[in-house]
Amino acid sequence: MASFVTEVLAHSGSLEKEDLGTRISRLTRRVEEIKGEVCNMISKKYSEFLPTMQSAQALVTQVDTLSNDIDQLKSRIETEVCRDLHISTVEFTNLKQQLERDSVVLTLLKQLQEFSSAIEEYNSALAEKKYIPAARHLEEAQECLKLLKSRKCFDLKMLKSLSMELTVQKQNILYHLGEDWQKLVVWKFPPAKDTSSLESCLQTELHLCTEQPEKEDMTPLPSISSVLLAFSILGELPTKLKSFGQMLLKYILKPLVTCPSLHAVIERQPSSVSICFESLTTDLEHPSPPEAFAKIRLVLEVLQKQLLDLPLDADLEIGKVPGIVLAEMLGEGIWEDLSECLIRNCLVYSIPTNSSKLQEYEEIIQSTEEFEKFLKEMRFLKGDTTDLLKYARNINSHFANKKCQDVIVAARNLMTSEIHNTVKIGPDCKEALPDLPSPDADHKLQVQTVCKAQFTDAGNLEPETSLDPQSFSLPTCRISEAVKKLMELAYQTLLEATTSSDQCAVQLFYSVRNIFHLFHDVVPTYHKENLRKLPQLAAIHHNNCMYIAHHLLTLGHQFRLRLAPILCDGTTTFVDLVPGFRRLGTECFLAQMQAQKGELLERLSSARSFANMDDEENYSAASKAVRQVLHQLRRLGIVWQDVLPVNIYCKAMGTLLNTAIAEMMSRITALEDISTEDGDRLYSLCKTVMDEGPQVFAPLSDENKNKKYQEEVPVYVSKWMPFKELMIMLQASLQEIGDRWADGKGPLATAFPSSEVKALIRALFQNTERRAAALAKIK
């Protein structure tokens, strides 16, 4: 201990080495002497029982003095040791850091050496096309580079060079792997750019190499499994399989799904397996789901055996790389697109159009389940039920959606078809509407019981006179053939709803309502110009609207007890649509009537107000205007003949003829001077209208039946009798006019007010006493 302390103190400049050693030696000897004396004293005190109290106290004093000297020396030593210890620690730390730097440099050099060795071994393996060892060596080089990059003190320029070298080598091996992959998996495409046609598909082939070539002049190819494993080690397998999957989907799987006549043919050769196509004649526009599933299954089975089920795990180090499932990787890349293709091109078209065929769809659901089970067994799929099977199982919803879509499309096609193709309807015409099933027997019994309970004590409530059986029938007229089919479509759809599920029934019911909403919006817009320009089409459209409104009155009631319970609470009605359809037809026909009135008035405006008929030019213009008016009315009578119901026809023609007559009367009564010749010619013009006017009333094609309506012209033309009185006045004398006035009780008084009669008398006769007397009688 003394030598260690002395050695430590030797490094201090404040304490001399010899002095310190001497004093320590002296203290040591003194300690030994005192120890002996103390022992001797204790022996004498406790062993010999000598009275040594005084000597003991002296010894205590000496011991205390010695202890103080020791403490001072110890304190001095500690001070010196701490000072030198700090200096030694700093030096030791510097040495340690130097050692660590040397170790890091040594490690970096070792990593560089390993990187270089890995690259050399990689090049050797690549030259021999040993792709798996080459990929592993490249992976080792990449790990070395990662460690080098983790050292912040490493030269950045060198790191950049190493990274570039590694990238170049990786691209090099990927290039060689890609070349061999193209030799192992060979695609053959047609020369044409259009690959979607059937001819192009028939020229598309996929060849998978299964064995090594035996020819000496050919370089042996690596196995597909070694190429795939090398891709996996390099992290490029998912990308490569995804690219292969997209080509497989585009050039093989999708054509098989979309083209029903296309079938896959498997050709097996000693060193390869080929997948090509053949075309078989078929009448189907779209393949059935079971057929499409079988086509895809055949292709996937070949790929499973020749490509997807190859052993890739045998050469992998345990625990380093997880097991590779090629089928699963391929499925992840293409299943979403493949299932969507199957749904859009197969399952959609397999949905029944009639509820009676829904039971047959169970076979398609079963085939879909088997197809999905096969895909899961080959590990192409994983997890729960896919969208494909969910779509197939949700048949009720798809059936309803498709049915509703088909109904709306068919309805719109009918609405946009030609209006002028018509059929005759009437009380005697039985429209081809479907027979409705009877309500449930229980409901009938319940209704009968209620009726009996309510009217047991009632008397005879039958009216004395019964209504005509045709009281609520639609009058005979012509409607568009398309509208008749549209109504049949509505009945058929509601009849379909009676045998469908509740959800489907609700959708079908509201689809029928949508048909009529669509008619209200589409027809007036789509046929706008024709309805405005062609009076016959306007009349047919009027009939169409009235025909639809007529059926809507009872359509809901007919199906009220046959639809789903959810619809039997009062919502099964179409009555709310009736006013809209009546208004739609009426407005269209009234607009046409206004247009015809405008044309009539425009023609009469060229008659020069029927003034100065003694002028040949004026008379010719007036005569021409009258003939044009009659011609227009005859033309309307022909185009509306057998189209409009008789009562509507007569009212319409009567209104137009009345407009023309009223205009002629207003112009003639406004004349201030009518000469005898003018009167004769005006009478002639009016006589033409009076004779030919009734002939425009020809609602029926049978002329003999039209006589009835021609005789009833005054019923439909309110100005007919006043017009006849005007003709009489134009040829009558003052006496005859007075007689027809008959003190305001004659036919003339009924036809004209006194002011107009007086004005006509003043225009027709000169100012004489007889005229004054006649005017005096007109009051």
From Swiss-Prot:
Protein name, per record: Centromere/kinetochore protein zw10 homolog
Its membrane topology: Peripheral membrane protein
A GO cellular component annotation in the UniProt record: spindle pole
Quaternary structure annotation from Swiss-Prot or TrEMBL: Interacts with NBAS and KNTC1/ROD; the interactions are mutually exclusive and indicative for its association in two different vesicle tethering complexes. Component of the RZZ complex composed of KNTC1/ROD, ZW10 and ZWILCH. Component of the NRZ complex composed of NBAS, ZW10 and RINT1/TIP20L; NRZ associates with SNAREs STX18, USE1L, BNIP1/SEC20L and SEC22B (the assembly has been described as syntaxin 18 complex). Interacts directly with RINT1/TIP20L bound to BNIP1/SEC20L. Interacts with C19orf25 and ZWINT. Interacts with ZFYVE1.
Cellular location(s): Cytoplasm; Endoplasmic reticulum membrane; Chromosome, Centromere, Kinetochore; Cytoplasm, Cytoskeleton, Spindle
GO terms, biological process: cell division; endoplasmic reticulum to Golgi vesicle-mediated transport; establishment of mitotic spindle orientation; Golgi organization; mitotic metaphase chromosome alignment; mitotic sister chromatid segregation; mitotic spindle assembly checkpoint signaling; protein localization to kinetochore
The keyword Membrane is assigned to this record: yes
PANTHER family referenced in this protein's UniProt entry, alphabetically: CENTROMERE/KINETOCHORE PROTEIN ZW10, CENTROMERE_KINETOCHORE PROTEIN ZW10 HOMOLOG
Gene3D superfamilies to which the protein is assigned, alphabetical: 1.10.357.150
